[in-house]
Amino acid sequence: MTEKILIREFIKDKNVGAVFSAGRNVIKKMLESIDFNKACLLVEYGPGKGVITTHLLERMRKDAVLFVFETNEMFVKELLNIRDERLVIINEDAYNAQTILKNRYKINKVDYVISTIPFTFFDRRKRKRVISKTYNLLNENGKFITYQYTGLIYQLIKQRFHQTRVMAAVLNIPPAIIFTGIK
């Protein structure tokens, strides 16, 4: 998918949060927090065209599973081009991830949740609920990793998670902030 299509989807779909895909610097910093030797169940919120998804799949164990939640139909079509049996594409809102994983897949807890969804598009109540639901979805010591362009959700992550880490990806355009919440 070209950046032109990404820009078109950004304009057309109010839920698309970025004009450009995550840069290498952001991806590298996000993946540093994942222990791929131990990670069995991973969830990605808002994978877009699958840039981070493909990096996750390259590093995941053979028996691990990655559930991705994407609402944009054009991006879902792109994700379907990724041929990997460990990838489960769910055309639903990440807000419902916990319920969907429990009811459809009998999964109560996961090791990691990676998110690129635009929390700035949500009101405070929805931001708080998504973070709370994410916390509840994680195993003990599980991690929630997200990158954002503002510090808007830092306090919510800090309030909910036992530990938080913040990294800047200043080489990204625009510069991004990577937040990690550890349960």
Model-derived segments and their meaning:
Residues 128-140:
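A short glycine-rich, Lys/Arg-flanked "PGG" loop and its adjoining helix->strand segment in the class I
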Residues 140-148:
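Conserved beta-strand signature within the Rossmann-like core of class I S-adenosyl-L-methionine
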